[in-house]
Amino acid sequence: GGGARRWHGSCLRLPPPHRRRPHHTRCDSQVGSLADGGAGRSGARQRFELKEGGRGDGAAARDEITALTLGAGHAAAYRAACADLGWAPDEAGASAAEAQHVERLAALDAKHADAKENLGDVEIFDALLAKAQELAAEGAPRARVVEAFDEALAGTVATGHKLDICFQRMVLCLADHDLVGLKELLDNAQKLLDEGGDWERKNRLKVYQGVYFMAVRDFKRAAELLLSSVATFASSELFSYERFVFYTVVVASVALPRTELKAKVVDAPEILSAVGAVPHLESFLSAFHGCRYAEFMRAFSGIEEEV
């Protein structure tokens, strides 16, 4: 009903009407919190949550981000987080991490040279891909990371390898809040799959497409794609299955008619198996569908913090 509609924009942080961006543009939305796996920037999700959502206390968040960046030897990502969050960086630790990064790149270059000299195309591709992943995790400039992925891409004719690079670059786009780049990669991946791709990668693409449509506020298409992936979820580089169910339930609650919500979400075995693992989500869904609005509003306050 109309009352239920009023909370939708708040829950998913729609900007006010005069500031809404058209589809396919950059968007500093909750999309940034999704990218902390695969080829994403180290600590991207935690950094986003602390800056945009105000989640967690400062000391615990700093320790977590430092462990994910400096602790993993990724100095550029650490310095970027410090600059973004107003922290004074540990310069000695950052310098040591930077030296580790340089050593890793040198080792990967040596591995690539050895593969070219003594091994085959698969080993060459693996070395180039590993270097691109290292640059991405380090937080190297986007142009350098893309160039490294393109070099790996040029060394393979396998559709699966090309799709895997597309997915890893999509994670990078999510970390950088670049929805234009993400849309281009989604289109490229769809073309590759149309030419011939396996079911596992087709199912992974549906999740990425669902995330994109969620980010550009096309909640109906997002719900359709995410719901179609509930039984085949294979995109753990984006988020856990529980987090995937969380987004699916919230978006479906926004987009689906009540009868469809009951059939595809409220009574869905896969949803029921995971919904209890997410704080407030089970009571949010049950109360919303059952029109118990006092209970719903109590659950909603917890859900809003998680979105």
Locate each region found by the language model.
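Extended alpha-helical scaffold regions
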Residues: 1-307
